[in-house]
Amino acid sequence: MASETENLRAIALDPSHPTPTDVGEIYDETSDSLTDMLGGYIHVGYWEDPSKQETAEVVGDRLTREVGVRLSPAQGEHILDVGCGTGKSTAQLAGIYDAQVTGITISKQQVEVARSQYGRKMPAGQVHFQFADAMDLPFGDASFDGAYAIESLVHMLDKRTALAQIAQVLRPGSRLVIADLVSDHPCPDSPVLARYAEIFEPPLVSADDLQNLLRQAGFKVIDVTDIRENIRPSCKLFETKGLSLGGELGQKLLEIASILEEMNELGYALITAERL
């Protein structure tokens, strides 16, 4: 019987699944609506107290800080933001840690917005944004002192290659922090995961399988924290925006809201790993 990792590789080679170009074009079309909904970010928020009402910007800021604490870059270090969106998290962590951060995205629209909103407002050379595919990184070996990926691996068909590429551009001893959706099971054997699979490609991986892929790519897993309960209130942000937008995008946001609200089998992991 094929292993889960072998199955993921087969999925990555299946031409019926979306390519990086497809994903980039989706974000070209939806980034404005998503950043408006998520307080300038393109990732969910982190609630310390899920019963407390907070703004999208506050909770988005907090999730970014959770990533930053785990990465803990030193002043002046060069960090890679894998899937930078429109650049808010990139600029935020560069400012907090006085680090140099390069953000990459496969959305041309996101590159333009990031450069306009943050690239020209930060100190010269502190942030840099470019169009690049994480599965084929255009950087030299050991170019970076650390990296993070917030809700970007979930879109990548060949996660093994992406993680190997990230490992290649990191210096030994550097950290990689991942914040992303994961499943408790390797296949959609529950109603919630089945609904997720209907509207998202590629399929989710389990946290265990993601850790195995990290080890195969040359990382040591340091910590895994499941924060599904802390991000669950994000469903209200999707619901509110979906109702206001209407149409196809509005309907998809409402479906995402429903899935997040019922995500007993749908996890959200903060994974800290070290390049060996």
Curated annotation (Swiss-Prot):
Record-linked SUPFAM superfamilies: S-adenosyl-L-methionine-dependent methyltransferases
Description of the deletion phenotype: Abolishes the biosynthesis of communesins A and B and leads to the accumulation of desmethyl versions of communesins A and B, including communesin C.
Positions bound to S-adenosyl-L-methionine: 110, 133-134, 155
Classification via CDD domains: AdoMet_MTases
Signal peptide segment: none
EC number per UniProt: 2.1.1.-
Pfam entry (one): Methyltransf_11
SMART domains referenced in this protein's UniProt entry, alphabetically: PKS_MT
Keyword presence, Zinc-finger: no
Cofactor: S-adenosyl-L-methionine
Keyword Zinc: no
Keyword list, A-Z: Methyltransferase, S-adenosyl-L-methionine, Transferase
InterPro entries, per the entry: Erg6_SMT_methyltransf, MeTfrase_dom, Methyltransf_11, SAM-dependent_MTases_sf
One record GO biological process: methylation
Free-text function comment from the UniProt entry: O-methyltransferase; part of the gene cluster that mediates the biosynthesis of communesins, a prominent class of indole alkaloids with great potential as pharmaceuticals. Communesins are biosynthesized by the coupling of tryptamine and aurantioclavine, two building blocks derived from L-tryptophan.
Name this polypeptide is given: O-methyltransferase cnsE
UniProt gene name: cnsE
